């Protein structure tokens, strides 16, 4: 089992690239750092944490050390988290928090080493896909059973259910990064179009726009996401078999291939946040769908492009739903301090502390009360404020694209291979989908 766990972790760690921390679709540069902190709001956020620490009491009375892993947050948020931890330790003098911030490039090796060596941390920051991979190996605590009703009640239901398998839930949702649209107003004007609202509208305008501007209108989403956005079921109702190998999926790939073959849309790097940002910053792409935190990178790397940006809701398919990548806190079964770990993870993700974190960086909370705070819609004078308000709006019709099955990362990778085979390599579309179907069914069978 351990050998299989390590191999799956290695694959799942690749998927972390797409969702690590709060940065969009495939980010390495920005996604591991929760972007840069906003100088405004930092002081108020730190202050707010001290008022809630006393309510986050652990029931543990014996001295205990909780090891808490985050992914590349210390560089920009060390003061914030040190204050959170200090307040918690003051309220719980028997609990010591050992914060370990794992560098982005070391996520895979450190996690694999910890699992193999029996030195698992107590609370770990993971995206939903990687969490579900660990669920497939029976490696995480079922928080639906282990957490109290009070602890569970604070979260937005759809986000609480992101790491749900059957009746079990394996993660406390932490912060989300709802996709919004950034678009280059000058390119739109040059192309003689207004920002499209849907993928179909974008496709209708893509060829003329490319001919008029020599830029791409948009970079297609990764194939797995496109299926969900276009209401093509990934799995059957009981989630035991693949269901995506349909004529609708064939037609979807054929439609996009007709544009990539003409060079109207990019053929490679579908769904890559980093590639999209590079093209956008160089004036070769008009639309980027990403979280509000991406503005910091664009402003630093391409200030002239930053000045052209307007925001809108993201492109959507027939479902009208957009992506809302979620970061979570999980408690490994290997933790020797599960009760204390659950209490601390719930504290980090409670209303006050999530709202405080959101005031330092452009992310969105997973708790009901925090998400309704006027902070997210009160400032629309700045581009960052407009992005925050748009994130709040987009979050109402967004979701973490979770299948609710173990080993989602491997399933996602298998499905995306159909795009690589057919669009990039030019293989037969039907054959590529058939192979992906067989691969997914094999993964699902191994989950049983």
Go through the PLM ranges and name each one:
Residues 103, 127-180, 203, 209-211, ...:
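Hinge/lid segment of periplasmic solute-binding proteins
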Residues 19-42:
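Bacterial lipoprotein signal-peptidase II cleavage site
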Residues 312, 360-413, 421, 447:
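Long, aromatic- and glycine/proline-rich binding clefts that accommodate carbohydrate-like moieties
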Residues 134-139, 158-194, 219-239, 253, ...:
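Periplasmic solute-binding protein
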Residues 86, 90-91, 254, 258-265, ...:
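Extracytoplasmic/periplasmic substrate-recognition and gating elements
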Residues 87-155, 162, 186, 190-197, ...:
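Extracytoplasmic "Venus flytrap"/periplasmic binding protein-like
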Residues 36, 47, 189, 396-448:
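Conserved C-terminal helix/tail region of periplasmic/extracytoplasmic solute-binding proteins
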Residues 206-210, 241-269:
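Glycine-centered hinge/linker elements that transmit conformational signals in sensory
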